[in-house]
Amino acid sequence: LFFCCTFFLFLAFNSLSNETGTIIEIDNPKFSEKGLTNNEYEIKAEKGLKSPDGMKLIQVEGKFKTKDDIWIFMNAEIGIFNQTSNNIRLEKNIHFYTDANETISSEFATYDIESGIIELTNNVLFKNNEIEIHANKCTLSNGFEKIIYDGNVLTKISIKNK
């Protein structure tokens, strides 16, 4: 009897530990918030891997509306989305861009959707029609209005003759 009880407890514990480590694959996951706060957004991916730690997203796309009604678009190969804290950590081939022909790219980024702050690191490159800036790190806030560059910063300005 003792052996049977121990065996069933072992099985119960084993199945419980497997449930907490289970990864669920989701095709085309999509997260959005509209109208609840000023921070309207939509994040979608080709595939999601849900685990107790969060949701890993593969081939991520997103769009975020600023307080000034400017849309910021984003894409990356990998993202870790935390809906509770409303932030996304991005990796590999990250690009943020606007309809005003402004783009910024890097290897890693975090985007806090509540505050609207985007932090990019490793091989940061900002481009618009007139300026190209390379940096180690960049922090964006207020849409693309406030940009702070850190580390080795190189700026190229194009002067167009009229």
Segments and roles (model prediction):
Residues 1-162:
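Mature-chain termini and adjacent capping regions
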